[in-house]
Amino acid sequence: TATERKRVSFGKIPEAMELPNLISVQRESFERFKDEGLREAFKESSPIQSQNHVLEVTFGEHQFGDPAHTVEECREKDMTYQAPLLTDVRLTNKETGKIKEQLVFMGDFPMMTDQGTFIINGTERIVVSQLVRSPGVYYSSEMDSGKQIYKAQIIPSRGAWLEFEVDKRDQLMVSIDRKRKQSATMFLRALGIAVTNDDIIELLGNSDVIKRTLERDTALTREDALIEIYRRLRPGAPPTVDASRSLLEGLLFNPQRYDLARVGRYKVNKKLNLTTEEEVTVLTDEDIVATLRYLLSLAAGEQGFKVDDIDHFGNRRIRTVGELIQNQFRIGLSRMERVVRERMSMQEPDEITPQSLVNIRPIVAAI
């Protein structure tokens, strides 16, 4: 048995602070993933509905079984230290009201050792934490043809980027999910935040930037704005008002596809002096309006409004092992969703069971 090593210092100068248990960061992150992270991922994927909306699959509570082998056995026999993941899966037939519930095996999941490592095929490995840009709202400026350009970016933890810009023509533009730029006032009309020119002026002021933007904006109704935005986001697809509305809803306001995360919500609230609850991790109309007001004030050179330093550690965060694995698990679940929908449409509703619908291969492959 391995004896515990004791650290002894022969230095004459006392240490300024006791060395913290650095492995605890990895351990706590993984334990949080096993409980909260998996629950969040399953909740985001539920419910999965069939194309005719008759059948519905919902994920419930999950649990881990015991590892089949010890850490030492896995090292010696070139095996992976893992434990089975089991989840309650409920299948509901909305036409008959019949409910089938089963505890479904979701695959063997690599487990973390006490040293914060994983044993994969007998080899000890670690997941390295990443230093990434924190979700939130960021302001920047750059020179273009001798003119100062001001930009605002709303960056989520997961989902479409929203970028606003006061361009070299002094017009307020928006780019949704890195697509072609378009008038920001058209975007406000499409969302129903401000439909008429008077509404927009009342919301954002009557500056020269707003006047020039409204002059360029060809869509004067919400329906026109929705059609125009859909044309630019999905060129080639037949544009309809309903399709455009559901597209914008899915891109920016659907928790399954858009997530600021709690840290992103905190950063947005702090930057824009908002009081939105931390649990609200999708965009709100208030977020968009406050972002535009700050950008216009920044472009006008008003006191107290400044650009952000992207490289400042205050604008970065650590993405630890639990979050990294959760992101991979989320990818596997989204691939599995497509398989579940296909099987729902191919099998007889009365013969389907939760176990027959769930295919764990996409999840195992993603992890």
Where do the protein language model's features map onto the residues?
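N-terminal non-catalytic structural scaffold regions of very large proteins
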Residues: 1-367
